[in-house]
């Protein structure tokens, strides 16, 4: 009798564990898909603009002897950002 009760308890615990694990996997998949959808819906120029800002932060913390190179790169990044904005404006007009 005691063995049967423990077997039933074990089966119930196993089923609960499997259902809980499946639910956690489901939630992870939904979260992953939501993140992917958000990343596709986000405008490309906005993503690139964020990358430009991150690069500027990295360049701003560089040692002084490397500043000139980074200043040139920062200028180039500003030009790229300006062109991206122009491209975005022209796309929005059409």
From Swiss-Prot:
Q: Where in the cell is it found?
A: Host membrane
Give Gene Ontology CC terms: host cell membrane; membrane
Q: Which residues form a coiled coil?
A: 64-94
Transmembrane domains' residue ranges: 5-27
Top-level taxon in the UniProt lineage: Viruses
Major localization class? host cell
Keywords for the protein's UniProt record, in alphabetical order: Coiled coil, Host membrane, Membrane, Transmembrane, Transmembrane helix
Membrane topology summary: Single-pass membrane protein
Name of this chain's protein: Uncharacterized protein ORF94
Q: Which organism is it from?
A: Acidianus filamentous virus 1 (isolate United States/Yellowstone)
